[in-house]
């Protein structure tokens, strides 16, 4: 069965640029009714919405300035009051900073879980909702291990475990909410620019050698994967998109 994005209301965290913005573009091209971009970056957010509305028509995209670690209640209330029903939440906001453990966990794990809980309860069919889909942006580092970025890897392992449990078949059948993960390989974004390991220059040089040998991809590749995953993935599953190749379940 292919799930259809036509007329769906979509919320994307970290949607002002990069993977989030590219995904909004692909979802609107597939017929989504509206994409609501929430992001702390107001400048890029305003530009993103202007570009999307210029391309797809007025009111197809909206930007809401938001710190995902602090503004969930206010922003979700605003969204639910205006749109009544949200069909898709994409938890895309994230950071890669080995020098700030607490912030990494707050954004990559805690906020992602909190937004998932809020929108899961909104979507629950047993709670008056209409069902829906939550897509969590994990990473190849949600299931692969190397020695370079343990804090980031730990955060993404948490996302994978959370997604598989929240999206468990039992829960999906009971509540009508599908939860899946997209696991991008190295992608050309601000997130992956100038990444520094925490320890020393020897480790940094080895990390950079690894990056040179790694297949890279563009944000559009991940956005297309987010469409493919929405259309075909079963709840509780996780999908790899790496080196611009077709998605593969992991």
Where are these regions (language model features)?
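Conserved glycine-rich cofactor-binding loop
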Residues: 16-17
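Conserved glycine-rich Rossmann-like NAD(P)H-binding loop of the short-chain dehydrogenase/reductase
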Residues: 32-47
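Conserved NAD(P)H cofactor-binding loop of Rossmann-fold oxidoreductase domains
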Residues: 92-97
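Substrate-binding pocket helix/loop in short-chain dehydrogenase/reductase
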Residues: 100-104
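Active-site helix of classical SDR
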Residues: 116, 155
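Residue(s) in the substrate-gating loop at a strand-loop-helix junction
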Residues: 139
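C-terminal helical subdomain
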Residues: 181, 200-250
């Amino acid at each position: 069965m292919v799930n259809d994005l036509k007329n769906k209301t979509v919320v994307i965290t970290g949607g002002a640029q990069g993977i989030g913005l590219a995904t909004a573009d692909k979802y609107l091209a597939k017929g989504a009714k509206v994409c609501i971009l929430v992001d702390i970056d107001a400048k890029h957010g305003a530009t993103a919405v202007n570009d999307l509305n210029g391309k797809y028509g007025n009111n197809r995209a909206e930007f809401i300035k938001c710190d995902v670690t602090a503004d969930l209640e206010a922003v979700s209330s605003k969204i639910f009051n205006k749109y009544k029903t949200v069909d898709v939440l994409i938890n895309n906001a994230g950071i890669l900073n080995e020098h700030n453990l607490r912030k990494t966990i707050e954004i990559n794990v805690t906020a992602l879980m909190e937004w998932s809980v809020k929108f899961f309860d909104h979507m629950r069919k047993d709670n008056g909702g209409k069902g829906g889909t939550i897509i969590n942006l994990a990473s190849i580092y949600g299931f692969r291990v190397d020695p370079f970025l343990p804090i980031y890897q730990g955060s993404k392992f948490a996302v994978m475990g959370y997604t598989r449990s929240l999206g468990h078949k039992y829960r999906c059948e009971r509540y009508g909410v599908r939860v899946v993960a997209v696991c991008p390989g190295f992608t050309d974004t601000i997130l992956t620019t100038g990444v520094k390991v925490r320890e020393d220059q020897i480790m940094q040089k080895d990390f950079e050698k690894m990056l040179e040998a790694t297949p890279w991809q563009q944000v559009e590749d991940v956005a297309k994967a987010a469409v493919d995953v929405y259309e075909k993935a079963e709840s509780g599953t996780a999908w790899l998109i790496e080196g611009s190749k077709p998605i593969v379940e992991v």
